[in-house]
A protein has these predicted regions:
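Polar, acidic low-complexity tracts enriched in Ser/Thr/Gln/Glu with frequent Gly/Pro and Thr-Pro motifs
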Residues: 27-139
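Membrane-interface helical sensory segment of bacterial ECF anti-sigma factor regulators
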Residues: 1-41
Length: 139
């Protein structure tokens, strides 16, 4: 019985370790992430890819910052070889009506000012971008 108990404990530890490794996320450092900006028609998309191809990225948007800015927090995690990931990177986009008006997520229109800032949170720093500056699809 002792051998069975030890085997069960070892299997549980290995399973727990593998599960933690592939499900535990972290905020990546800025030097680990490639960020691109692309404009297709009126839609500007920011794309975030980890330089390590075995790491997938997700992005979470937070409107509730104290200064009223929009904040993207990136999250990285190891790619699980047992699950097919639909995408490697994280994406966030704006639909511009013109250079100073965008559609909000609820479909309403919003006039942009110089105070409308997008903050991208990395482990080592925050990058601030004026949303108006994204209208041409360049960073």
């Amino acid at each position: 019985w002792r051998a069975i108990g030890v085997t069960v404990i070892i299997c549980a530890l290995v399973f727990g370790g593998v599960t933690y490794y592939y499900n535990h996320g972290w905020i990546p450092s800025s030097e680990d992430v490639n960020m691109t900006c692309e404009k297709v028609g009126d839609v500007v998309t920011l794309s975030f890819y980890n330089k390590d191809k075995n790491v997938t990225m997700t992005a979470y948007l937070d409107y509730s910052t104290k200064d009223g800015s929009e904040q993207i927090t990136l999250n990285a995690r190891h790619a699980n070889p047992f699950k097919k990931s639909m995408r490697q990177g994280a994406y966030y986009g704006y639909t511009f009506i013109d250079d100073s008006i965008v559609y909000n997520e609820d479909g309403s229109k919003r006039k942009l000012t110089d105070e409308d800032i997008l903050v991208i949170k990395y482990k080592d720093k925050d990058v601030k971008i004026k949303i108006k500056d994204l209208a041409d699809g360049k960073l």
